[in-house]
């Protein structure tokens, strides 16, 4: 563990490099329930870090000496200066996390430490010395980065060579000789310092690129195997050496899809995809076709990760003690990531698709659910996909509680310790049921945030009133996505909403031929529900505000009374 760190905030006048310390201890990594539990900010031995300033400087000197053939005292004095900082941000709760993301939307933030070696997933980071109110997040930033109000710690000074950007066209591969313009530009910017000017001159004079330096450092520290696939040589073949193994820089992306068991293959829309390795990461989001493109061009193999998170909600593993975020990895590739997810991962995608549509997609003009602001934080949606018992029960364990305590339902929205809790069970359920259930439960949080002062006020509303609204949401969303509706209607989950909308004289449960009401829009109905606190109040609101004969509506007060009486007395 670090024996001391420098903590900074916006008002701190200290240099961000003051108080910097390094640890020579590798972290102890525990495995609990298949989860990689990391307890230190520094994971692998810093002495073997290929991106440390010391090792990159040693590698640079070795390359210059190898090409000059002269053991120059002048060369031995050459030293690189850090161009990146490895940072731990200390966000003050979800409000602080929102503040950090709003300050710099380009930051690629991780909930676990970064390392020069691959990290086994799923991983969680636990620092018992931090108060529960603090959310630690890890990132790398340029050395001259202008920090915002979020407190932070400098964990390491680094010299990073990627990306290959300025010398390359967006669509074409970079030439083999292309150097990292980001790193070169940094050296040039600091060339006013005599040491930096000398470094640039020596590198230029000897024809040494920063890519050569990085190769040397990776080789010198024993990390080359993590960056390229070993060569398979035929008899008589000579091995390819140096940067030729990597070839040219390449822009990487791909297309992500999933299988809906009723609709077939569907695009995975809006998911955040990170791509990179070690300390250098970039991110993109999948478009309407599930396609994405990671910024910049890469000479090494990179790791991809699809993250089911957004500013307003995220999916987490309901079975885990640690509640780690759901994510899908595709590691160690220098090619596009094109994959169609099946099984449990496809079910995660269905939950995500429903939530993403309600928050950001076509929601038919309805009010959006809760948004992530300083007073309203993102919603964690617990997904239970391995078994039914963890969802059904609330199980005390040696650690925190796991389970939802949701009984035989498929989804649950409740107040837990004064906060919202949402659980979705995908185990044994069809894509349609998962999609519909997710819409139903998100509808509850939308109802709450658009109408109520507190969770207790919301849950004081009649149970049947709340679930009539969310059953109606299932009706319209399900009909739009699947072209048909497969729902049941009972006393607390009434069919009033489809009966107000359709022109079928039968009630939504098919039992009575009394429905003479038609033509209402879901937007009209939602306004009536959000303005009232019971089904009877909703009926009065409709009579007073939505006259028959306008906007396609057709009904008499008697017909409306008869329809509501049926569902209230079923």
Please describe what each predicted stretch is.
Residues 44, 53-57, 71-77, 493-570:
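Pan-zinc metallopeptidase signature
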Residues 422-438, 461:
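Short pre-active-site segment immediately N-terminal to the catalytic Zn-binding motif
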Residues 457-501:
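Post-HExxH zinc-binding segment in Zn-dependent metallohydrolases
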Residues 275-294:
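Short, acidic Ser/Thr/Gly-rich low-complexity loop/linker segments typical of extracellular
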Residues 63, 251-279:
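Short, ordered, surface-exposed loop/turn motifs in non-cytosolic proteins
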Residues 436-453, 467-471, 475:
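Active-site recognition of the HExxH zinc-binding catalytic motif
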Residues 3-32:
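Bacterial Sec-dependent N-terminal signal peptides
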């Amino acid at each position: 563990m670090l024996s001391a760190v420098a903590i900074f905030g916006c008002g701190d006048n200290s240099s961000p490099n003051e108080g910097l310390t390094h640890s020579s201890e590798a972290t102890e990594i525990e495995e609990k329930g298949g989860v990689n539990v990391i307890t230190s900010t520094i994971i692998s031995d810093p002495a073997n870090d290929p991106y440390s300033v010391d090792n990159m400087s040693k590698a640079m000197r070795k390359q210059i000496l190898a090409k000059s053939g002269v053991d120059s005292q002048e060369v031995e004095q050459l030293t690189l200066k850090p161009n990146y900082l490895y940072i731990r941000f200390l966000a003050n709760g979800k409000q602080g996390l929102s503040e950090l993301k709003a300050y710099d939307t380009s930051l690629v933030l991780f909930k676990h430490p970064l390392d020069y070696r691959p990290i086994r997933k799923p991983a969680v980071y636990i620092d018992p010395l931090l108060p529960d109110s603090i959310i630690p997040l890890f990132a790398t930033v340029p050395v001259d980065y202008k920090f915002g109000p979020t407190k932070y710690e400098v964990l390491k000074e680094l010299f990073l060579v990627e990306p290959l950007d300025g010398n390359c066209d967006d669509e074409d591969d970079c030439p083999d000789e292309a150097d990292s313009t980001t790193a070169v530009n940094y050296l040039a910017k600091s060339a006013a310092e005599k040491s930096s000017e000398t470094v640039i001159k020596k590198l230029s004079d000897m024809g040494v690129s920063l890519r050569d330096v990085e190769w040397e450092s990776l080789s010198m520290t024993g990390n080359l195997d993590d960056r390229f696939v070993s060569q398979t040589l035929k008899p008589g073949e000579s091995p390819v050496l140096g940067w030729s193994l990597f070839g040219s820089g390449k822009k990487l992306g791909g297309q992500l899809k999933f299988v809906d068991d009723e609709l077939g293959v569907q695009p995975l829309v809006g998911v955040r995809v990170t791509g990179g390795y070690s300390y250098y990461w970039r991110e993109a989001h999948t478009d309407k076709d599930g396609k994405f493109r990671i910024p910049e061009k890469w000479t090494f193999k990179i790791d991809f990760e699809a993250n089911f998170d957004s500013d307003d909600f995220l999916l987490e593993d309901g079975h885990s003690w640690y509640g780690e975020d759901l994510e899908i990895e595709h590691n160690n590739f220098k090619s596009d990531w094109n994959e169609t997810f099946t099984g449990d991962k496809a079910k995660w995608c269905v939950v995500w698709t429903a939530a993403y549509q309600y928050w950001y997609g076509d929601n038919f003009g309805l009010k959006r659910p809760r948004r992530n602001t300083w007073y309203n934080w993102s919603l964690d949606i617990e997904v239970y996909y391995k078994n039914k018992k963890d969802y059904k029960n609330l199980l005390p364990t040696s650690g925190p509680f796991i389970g939802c305590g949701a009984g035989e339902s498929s989804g649950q929205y409740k107040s837990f310790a004064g906060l919202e809790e949402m659980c979705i069970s995908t185990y044994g359920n069809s894509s349609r049921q998962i999609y519909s259930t997710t819409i139903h439960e998100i509808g509850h949080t939308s109802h709450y945030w658009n109408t109520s002062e507190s969770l207790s006020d919301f849950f004081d509303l009649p149970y049947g009133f709340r679930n009539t609204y969310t059953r109606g949401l299932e009706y319209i969303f399900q009909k739009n996505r699947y072209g048909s509706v497969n729902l049941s209607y009972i006393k607390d989950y009434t069919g009033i909403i489809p009966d107000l909308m359709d022109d079928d004289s039968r009630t939504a449960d098919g039992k009575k031929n009394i429905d003479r009401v038609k033509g209402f829009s879901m937007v009209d109905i939602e306004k009536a529900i959000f303005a009232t606190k019971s089904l009877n109040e909703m009926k009065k609101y409709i009579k007073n505000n939505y006259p028959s004969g306008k906007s396609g509506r057709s009904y008499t007060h008697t017909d409306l009374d008869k329809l509501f009486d049926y569902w209230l007395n079923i």
